């Protein structure tokens, strides 16, 4: 079958109502426009795709050697979404209430939390077309894209992909090894990756449009309706799909602060506090406490002074200070800053009060009287006059809803009696003072993320649930709030998504929500950060997230111009109705959650009125660009997705306004300027043309997904029945698998019964299709010899050579002969970020170039000696230094490094062997220059022995240095926690300096 026939058959199957062979059974909706764009080009068509997904996979544990054979339950998706994950839903699935718990099962299954980015397989007409599309994909950020199949008589297939995936074991169905808070961190990281994945996808769409690719026009109203490529459109209410309808296309820039004085890493914090000194001769931000900081990340008790205008960061020298903590609050009262509560460690929740004298820089502990103030952290505070108001927080597992007032004049606590519209218990919320009121937004109540807004009147000591017009902010916690003139701002928070990449502003004069989008520079995570006002600038310090398998991420200090932000939010507010009155919602709780409960509405118009209707929707910011325009009633009508604001305004049975009389069609559609009509007149125009408001059918028509394992089981069951073979063979189906390049690797225990050999061809074909694999292999154990050879068996495919790209580096190796270390990604990236421009590096265990290539390609080392004794790894290493164009700076030394390694030449030595590299520590000391250098010592260490391992490394290397005649001082400067190697066994790397 030639290319055109295969393309026609594939496109016909895509448009068919029959489910396809993907786990879902149909195309992922977010990338349908992208797939249509590719398929519309005469040289390409897509064969498989995934827009990106977050999932929790339940997979049975390996069978024990017990003689009683238990039937495998099979693996399944406990949770899967192609959108940003809902942390509350994930937690409810993993930590069900007692009433929802299921009965224990005989054989527990492992649970793995995953994120997998976009991947698209595309068949190309010829090799030239393939090379062009691969280059385009790489330029858009899909750097791991490549040609997976070509040659004489073969179809030319490429894969568009990137490697921002994550996979974290979280326990099993009997016991989870993680906490709900840690699951939230995982979800936040995955959502961040999902957002990055979608931005790359949008960028790829724009790149296609800029290079001659066009969308099919089957759903287009006119040539201007290419909604996926509207990034270049100058209509202020139209954007590239990442922004909200009716919000500005322009982005508010974040200005990174250039820090001098103390290292900027001291501001790499979260859970800290910040207050401003805004005087005529002094405009600074005081930062205290938090987690992170310079060197080893830990809870801090440093007091820092930042001058944002010049970037000067100073450490306040103090005789005494509060203990190290995070999750506390800091409030300014006159010339004093009061720090209250926080968490010193998991078992030590604080309720102490400390005061910092701004003029002298001296701390003093305050002994308070009055009502008891229970310990708490993650609470919120606001100061009005001489009093500090505290609400909520967390004490161990208890979330509190109490309100306490500290009178700083007599240091007396008072608890406020609960009455009226009292907020529910919560933590990780935010609160600010405005006049004689304090305003509180969001938080987490233990079950739900909140988006309610309360005000507290300090005179009547009463709470009020506020009702505000405009687009309500998304629910969040661990965010920040600030007050600027007559505006309250909200920034950052969890869940991390594009919704938290906007600055939400509450106009208190008009009681109206507004928002502007922020131009994030480096995936800033404003989670548990601080927001401080100095003049017209918003200073955001710190914030970040942590994942034990992937390290920590902190945000750089930035500055945002609020004059520009407020002005832009006012300019881009969608027009408000002039004479359409909306009935007030009597139920405040219903109103505040309207965004989460609203239906996905569309407006249906006859095709002949579609262009006119689209212009109205665009002009008034009512067109929802996050959803797709589609045809209805056999193409006679066009359905436009509309915003929630429009859905509230538009009522088909509402009488036409008196200011607009029914007119003839020509008068309505010709010569009419949309700039000259009001909001209500525009609504009436739509009604005149027969506009109907419908639920988005395309949005709701979702099919039940089937996992690859389900597909495989069904296909193999059918084969066994046809061949008359016993169904007990299904016990040997793989419950999990890995991917090496385009090879899918199933476990060594799969398909081991000799009976399988009689139906190999049918079985391997079915497995390959169900797993979307071009090549299929069965894992063998890594040989426990010095070369750690792989025994991978290729089941489908010609050979085991694969290409893998990560951190911009290409690794090529024969998977049947060489093992590949997936878990060292963060360490490879760390080595690549070392300053090695003028250094000579010796890698004593080079392998295929795991660390050699980062040193050469990213760290720009002057020269690297690569020692390796596995001939298969050396073959791959030679290929890799050539493929990455660094062969002239790499000397490969084959053989035992104790014999081949150079002596007295290295500024840096890498010892990347686990479980222990101690056998080559003498060689490493000998390789260093006479004046010393740095050693990166790898090892597997029991978690309870980490500190003693560091001491052992220091002492042993010191003894070796003395024995070699080196009078060096040997110190461990840092211990990097790379990953968990096994339960309670950590892969560590000690950075050791010898001088």
Swiss-Prot record:
Keyword Transferase: yes
Highest rank taxon of the organism: Eukaryota
Annotated signal sequence range: none
Region annotated tRNA wybutosine-synthesizing protein 3 homolog, chain positions: 1-212
Keyword list, A-Z: Kelch repeat, Methyltransferase, Multifunctional enzyme, Repeat, S-adenosyl-L-methionine, Transferase, tRNA processing
Biological process according to GO: methylation; wybutosine biosynthetic process
Matching SUPFAM superfamilies: Kelch motif, S-adenosyl-L-methionine-dependent methyltransferases, SSo0622-like
Start and end residues of each stretch annotated as tRNA wybutosine-synthesizing protein 2 homolog: 661-995
Catalysed reactions, semicolon-separated: 4-demethyl-7-[(3S)-3-amino-3-carboxypropyl]wyosine(37) in tRNA(Phe) + S-adenosyl-L-methionine = 7-[(3S)-3-amino-3-carboxypropyl]wyosine(37) in tRNA(Phe) + S-adenosyl-L-homocysteine + H(+); 4-demethylwyosine(37) in tRNA(Phe) + S-adenosyl-L-methionine = 4-demethyl-7-[(3S)-3-amino-3-carboxypropyl]wyosine(37) in tRNA(Phe) + S-methyl-5'-thioadenosine + H(+)
Single GO MF annotation: tRNA 4-demethylwyosine alpha-amino-alpha-carboxypropyltransferase activity
EC number: 2.1.1.282, 2.5.1.114
CDD domains (UniProt xref): AdoMet_MTases
PROSITE patterns: SAM_MT_TRM5_TYW2 (PS51684)
Residues annotated as binding S-adenosyl-L-methionine: 828, 896-897
Pathway the protein acts in: tRNA modification; wybutosine-tRNA(Phe) biosynthesis
Kelch repeats: 284-335, 336-386, 387-436, 437-486, 488-535
UniProt enzyme class: transferase
Listed InterPro entries: Kelch-typ_b-propeller, MeTrfase_TRM5/TYW2, SAM-dependent_MTases_sf, TRM5-TYW2-like_MTfase, TRM5/TYW2-like_N, tRNA_yW-synthesising, tRNA_yW-synthesising-like_sf
PANTHER family in UniProt: TRNA METHYLTRANSFERASE, TRNA WYBUTOSINE-SYNTHESIZING PROTEIN 2 HOMOLOG
Family stated for the protein in its record: In the C-terminal section; belongs to the class I-like SAM-binding methyltransferase superfamily. TRM5/TYW2 family.
Reported function: S-adenosyl-L-methionine-dependent transferase that acts as a component of the wybutosine biosynthesis pathway. Wybutosine is a hyper modified guanosine with a tricyclic base found at the 3'-position adjacent to the anticodon of eukaryotic phenylalanine tRNA.
Stated name of the protein: tRNA wybutosine-synthesizing protein 2/3/4
Native species: Arabidopsis thaliana (Mouse-ear cress)
Taxonomic classification: Eukaryota, Viridiplantae, Streptophyta, Embryophyta, Tracheophyta
């Amino acid at each position: 079958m030639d290319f055109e026939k295969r393309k026609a058959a594939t496109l016909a199957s895509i448009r068919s109502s029959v489910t396809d062979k993907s786990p879902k059974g149909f195309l992922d909706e977010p990338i349908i426009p992208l797939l249509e764009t590719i398929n519309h080009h005469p040289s390409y068509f897509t064969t498989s795709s995934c827009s990106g997904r977050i999932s929790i996979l339940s997979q049975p544990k390996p069978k024990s050697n017990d003689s009683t054979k238990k039937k495998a339950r099979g693996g399944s998706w406990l949770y899967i979404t192609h959108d940003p994950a809902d942390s509350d839903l994930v937690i409810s699935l993993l930590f069900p209430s007692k009433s929802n718990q299921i009965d224990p099962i005989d054989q527990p299954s492992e649970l793995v939390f995953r994120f997998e980015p976009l991947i698209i397989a595309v068949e190309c007409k010829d090799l030239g077309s393939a090379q062009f599309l691969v280059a385009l994909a790489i330029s858009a950020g899909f750097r791991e894209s490549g040609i997976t199949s070509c040659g004489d008589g073969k179809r030319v297939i490429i894969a568009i992909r990137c490697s921002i995936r994550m996979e974290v074991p979280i326990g099993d169905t009997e016991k989870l090894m993680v906490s709900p808070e840690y699951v939230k961190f995982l979800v936040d990281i995955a959502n961040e990756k999902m957002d990055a994945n979608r931005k790359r996808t949008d960028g790829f769409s724009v790149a296609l449009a800029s290079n001659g690719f066009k969308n099919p026009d089957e759903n287009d109203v006119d040539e201007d309706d290419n909604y996926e490529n509207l990034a270049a459109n100058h209509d202020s209410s139209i954007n590239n799909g990442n922004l909200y309808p009716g919000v500005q296309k322009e982005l508010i820039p974040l200005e990174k602060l250039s820090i001098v004085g103390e290292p900027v890493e001291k501001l790499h914090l979260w859970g800290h506090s910040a207050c401003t000194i805004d005087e005529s001769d002094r405009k600074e931000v005081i930062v205290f406490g938090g987690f992170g900081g310079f060197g080893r990340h830990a809870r801090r008790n440093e007091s820092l002074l930042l001058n944002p205008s010049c970037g000067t960061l100073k450490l306040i020298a103090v005789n005494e200070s509060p203990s190290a903590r995070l999750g506390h609050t800091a409030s300014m009262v006159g010339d004093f800053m009061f720090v209250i509560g926080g968490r010193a460690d998991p078992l030590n929740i604080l309720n102490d009060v400390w005061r910092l004298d701004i003029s002298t820089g001296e701390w003093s502990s305050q002994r308070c009287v009055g009502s008891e103030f229970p310990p708490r952290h993650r609470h919120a505070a606001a100061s009005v006059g001489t009093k500090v108001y505290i609400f909520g927080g967390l004490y161990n597992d208890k979330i509190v809803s109490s309100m306490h007032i500290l009178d700083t004049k007599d240091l007396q606590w008072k608890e406020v009696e609960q009455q009226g519209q009292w907020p529910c218990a919560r933590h990780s919320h935010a609160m600010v003072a405005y006049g004689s009121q304090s305003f509180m937004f969001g938080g987490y109540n233990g079950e739900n993320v909140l988006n309610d807004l309360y005000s507290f009147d300090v005179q009547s000591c009463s709470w009020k649930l506020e009702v505000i017009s405009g687009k309500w902010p998304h629910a969040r916690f661990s965010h920040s709030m600030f007050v600027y003139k007559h505006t309250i701002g909200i920034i950052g928070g969890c869940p991390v998504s594009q919704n938290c990449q906007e600055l939400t502003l509450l106009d208190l004069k008009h009681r109206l929500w507004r928002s502007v989008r922020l131009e994030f520079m480096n995936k800033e995570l404003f989670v548990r950060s601080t927001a401080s006002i100095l003049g017209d600038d918003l200073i955001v310090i710190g914030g970040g997230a942590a994942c034990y398998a992937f390290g920590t991420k902190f945000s750089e200090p930035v500055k945002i111009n609020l004059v520009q932000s407020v002005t832009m939010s006012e300019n881009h507010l969608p027009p408000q109705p002039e004479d359409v009155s909306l009935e007030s919602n009597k139920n405040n709780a219903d109103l505040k959650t309207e965004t989460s409960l609203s239906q996905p509405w569309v407006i249906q118009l006859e095709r002949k009125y579609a262009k006119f209707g689209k212009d109205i929707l665009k002009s008034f910011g009512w067109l929802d660009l996050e959803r797709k325009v589609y045809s209805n009633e056999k193409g006679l009508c066009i359905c436009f997705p509309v915003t929630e604001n429009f859905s509230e305004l538009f009522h088909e049975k509402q009488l036409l306004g008196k200011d607009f009389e029914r007119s003839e069609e020509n008068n309505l559609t010709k010569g009419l300027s949309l700039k000259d009509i009001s909001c209500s007149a525009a609504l009436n125009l739509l009604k005149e043309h027969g506009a109907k408001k419908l639920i988005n059918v395309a949005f709701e028509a979702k099919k039940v997904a089937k996992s690859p394992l389900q597909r495989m089981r069904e296909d193999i069951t059918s084969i066994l029945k046809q061949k008359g073979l016993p169904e007990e063979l299904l016990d040997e189906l793989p419950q999990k698998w890995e991917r090496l390049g385009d090879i899918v690797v199933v476990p060594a225990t799969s398909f081991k019964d000799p009976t399988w050999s009689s139906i190999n061809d049918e079985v391997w074909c079915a497995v390959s299709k169900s797993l979307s694999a071009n090549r299929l292999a069965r894992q063998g154990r890594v040989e426990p010899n010095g070369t750690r050879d792989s025994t991978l068996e290729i089941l489908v495919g010609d050979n085991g050579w694969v290409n893998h790209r990560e951190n911009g580096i290409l690794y090529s190796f024969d998977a049947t002969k060489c093992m590949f270390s997936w878990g060292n990604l963060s360490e490879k990236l760390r080595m690549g970020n070392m300053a090695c421009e003028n250094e000579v590096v010796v890698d004593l265990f080079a392998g295929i170039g795991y660390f050699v290539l980062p040193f050469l390609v990213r760290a720009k080392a002057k020269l690297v000696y690569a020692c390796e004794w596995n001939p298969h790894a050396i073959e791959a290493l030679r290929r890799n230094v050539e493929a990455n164009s660094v062969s002239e700076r790499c000397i490969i030394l084959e053989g035992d490094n104790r014999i081949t390694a150079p002596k007295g030449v290295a500024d840096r030595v890498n010892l990347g062997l686990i479980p222990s590299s101690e056998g080559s520590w003498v060689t490493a000391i000998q390789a260093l220059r006479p004046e010393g250098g740095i050693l990166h010592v790898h090892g597997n260490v029991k978690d309870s022995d980490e500190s003693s391992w560091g001491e052992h490394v220091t002492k042993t290397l010191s003894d070796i240095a003395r024995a070699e005649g080196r009078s060096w001082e040997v110190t461990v400067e840092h211990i990097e926690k790379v990953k968990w190697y096994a339960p309670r066994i950590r892969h560590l790397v000690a950075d050791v300096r010898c001088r």
